[in-house]
Amino acid sequence: MSTNPKPAFRRILLKLSGEALMGSEGFGIDPSVLDRMAQEIKELVELGIQVGVVIGGGNLFRGEGLAKAGMNRVVGDHMGMLATVMNGLAMRDALHRAYVNARLMSAIPLKGVCDDYNWAEAISLLKSGRVVIFAAGTGNPFCTTDSAACLRGIEIEADVVLKGTKVDGVYSADPMKDPEAVKYDELSYAEVLDKELKVMDLSAFTMARDHDMPILVFNMNKPGALRRVIMGEGEGTIIKK
């Protein structure tokens, strides 16, 4: 039973890693994970929350690895952007199957596949209760999907960027490797930088800090966690001023 019946946020930007879509498959997209995420997003829409989504592409392609093997980094990043479009198409389809109205906007024009990114239209769609999925990152190489999430979050004036990961918040060390790792419930931007905690890459993090965009890190693989985050029930770690 929720102790706080009113949602803590009105408009959110949900950042999902491509890896989150893999489930236990190790590669590609696990349909059952996709459908569960679509259902969790549907719950938010039914609460009246406006939802923007940015998905990574790491389950299908990673530009960095090939860049180290000699591929041009720009080419690798373009391939990574296209991987996020593939994930976006899968997510849009899953949402439609869950009877949720969703639009896919790409930072790279892909006529006939999805809409071009348009800021004013995105906000209009969010206000009308549509889920808007932002694909192809920022449209520029050398920018991570974390940067894209913060950029789109700032552009659509979201209340928070929710970063869905494999762990249930920010820890003092990697909880998978260090049993002594301590979870933080709340941090300031300065504390994250001082403690050199890995929340997201530095350019994305400083963009959020400079625009006072709160970041909330939570475990997307934990059923019901997304709803608890939205209801302000102390799920995950929040980072703000």
Swiss-Prot record:
SUPFAM superfamilies with a match to the protein in the record:
Carbamate kinase-like
Top EC category: transferase
Identify a single GO molecular function assigned to this protein.
ATP binding
**Activity: how regulated:** Allosterically activated by GTP. Inhibited by UTP.
Q: Which UniProt keywords apply?
A: Allosteric enzyme, ATP-binding, Cytoplasm, Kinase, Nucleotide-binding, Pyrimidine biosynthesis, Transferase
Instruction: Please state the Enzyme Commission number of this protein.
Output: 2.7.4.22
- Cellular location(s): Cytoplasm
**Which reaction is recorded as catalysed by this protein?**
UMP + ATP = UDP + ADP
Pathway(s) of this molecule: Pyrimidine metabolism; CTP biosynthesis via de novo pathway; UDP from UMP (UMPK route): step 1/1
Q: Name one Pfam family in it.
A: AA_kinase
| One Gene Ontology term, aspect cellular component | cytosol
Instruction: List ligand-binding residues for UMP.
Output: G57, D77, T138, G139, N140, P141, F142, C143, T144, T145
What is any one GO biological process for this UniProt entry?
UDP biosynthetic process
Which portions of the sequence form the region Involved in allosteric activation by GTP? Answer: 23-28
Q: Which residues bind ATP?
A: K15, L16, S17, G18, G58, R62, T165, Y171, D174
As for family, the record states: Belongs to the UMP kinase family.
Q: Which HAMAP family match?
A: PyrH_B
**Family annotation (NCBIfam families):** pyrH_bact
Listed under subunit, the entry gives: Homohexamer.
What is the recorded function of this protein according to its Swiss-Prot or TrEMBL entry?
Answer: Catalyzes the reversible phosphorylation of UMP to UDP.
Q: What is this protein called?
A: Uridylate kinase
**What's the source species for this entry?**
Shewanella amazonensis (strain ATCC BAA-1098 / SB2B)
The organism's lineage is: Bacteria, Pseudomonadati, Pseudomonadota, Gammaproteobacteria, Alteromonadales
The gene designation is pyrH
